[in-house]
Amino acid sequence: MPSPMNLSSSVTVLAPATVANVVCGFDVLGFALNEPNDTMHLRFTEQPGVTIINEDDYNLPTEPARNVAGAALLAFLRAVPEPVGIEVRISKAIKPGSGIGSSAASAAGAVVGANQLLGNRFSKPELVEFAMYGEEVASGVRHADNIAPGIYGGVTLIRATTPRPDIVPLSAPPLFVTVVHPQIEVKTSDARQILKQQVPLKLAIQQWGNVGALVAGLLQHDYNLIGRALEDVIIEPVRSILIPGFQEVKQGSQAAGALGGGISGSGPSLFMLSKDEATARAVEAVMHDVYERLGLDHHTYLTTINQQGVTLVAPPSA
């Protein structure tokens, strides 16, 4: 096990983007993407505590308690009995406010990397719990639907987050994911504030049915059922008004053969699931066309589901 006194010990990790909610599973479903990824380099320091170094131009806080990765590491270190100092350098390829888990990537990468430095003392559920403190900094809520797939990989169901995270990994058939990120910013905290706090029972019943059907479709590798279940009757009608081109992308993508999709996390990114790469490329063309007509800068990703979560680029070195 690496010792905190071995101050040359370091590790480099890739932390993946993630799609949260997966249309109908608000705060309880998510999956990891094979691209883009943040790169994070962690090493021990002589001074106990957390040091944050941002290697990009996003002007993110470096005070640990106000930084997503920093808050996650502070929670991690509170569970470590001996005094430990960790420096983390963050190079973000996942733009903050994009809706594809930028804050979760920082938090998940930080705790997985720190756990590697300390000899993997903590379990994945414990790492999720630490990383949720970072999400609280970003959104005001300690949620895990980006964190869990970022740490576990694949598709995850969050059965509960209290008193301890109860994460259920789900198998899924091969799926292609097309993501478009229109270059506007939607803050998670703002997107949560506009949500209704009370839901009519009729809509709740519809949503439960969709979540159950989506989980069943994934487990049974039933593409048709997956497509039918990708319906949100509670969150999407409220949040979609924040995203220009939402209806055009959704309708055009389904006409091109996509199984379905919707808002990634709180937006503004939109995602669509397809059974094959040819359909995913047709969906990408639809997305380009919509935002070119709207005159909005945008970026697309055509990728697949990342089954590993945060991965080591370079193992702990002495």
Regions found by a protein language model. Name each.
Residues P174-Q251, A255-A256:
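Acyltransferase
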Residues L218-A318:
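Glycine-rich, charge-dense phosphate/pyrophosphate-binding loop(s)
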Residues S3, P83-R164:
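Gly/Ser-rich oxyanion-binding loop with an adjacent helix/lid
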Residues R43, P149-T161, M272-K275, V313-P315:
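Short beta-strand-to-turn element immediately C-terminal to the catalytic PLP-Schiff-base lysine
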